[in-house]
UniProtKB/Swiss-Prot annotation:
GO terms for molecular function: RNA binding. This is Transcription antitermination protein NusB. It comes from Rickettsia conorii (strain ATCC VR-613 / Malish 7). GO terms for biological process: DNA-templated transcription termination; transcription antitermination. InterPro entries: NusB-like_sf (IPR035926), NusB_fam (IPR011605), NusB_RsmB_TIM44 (IPR006027).
Amino acid sequence: MSSNKINKKSIARIAAVQAIYQNILQNNDDMDDIMQNVLSFYQNNNAITDLPENLKISLSISHFKMLVKSVFENIHKLDEIIDNHLTNDKDPAHMPILLRALLRVSICELLFCPTTPAKVVINEYTDIANDMLNEHEIGFVNSVLDKIAKEHTRLI
């Protein structure tokens, strides 16, 4: 039986969203503690019980750590960017936590990881959003990332 693998960077992106979600939910600013909790979960293959037997999950630890550290270092700038993309009738304080976590990580990778093409970042996080968010939020993620990618390329 052949074993299937999911891209290690894709798993790192999901794990980074989980770490930032944990940061927001628990109001925990101990980045090392958060990263260790998430890494422990992924390193314990028995913790993920609803996967097919032949599916192997492992993440790029370096990409995960880079994403989480970059979000922590740029959190205020990221939140400002997110809030600037909200329509006037939306209150930033009422944004769902998971949506904010996903946007923080995705915008961070889009702006601060120039080695990853914008199209890849947009596709990856739209796929992640498809598994985690409702239809309206998925469209919002795609729209915001697309706008930021276009704005960013004009600045280069």
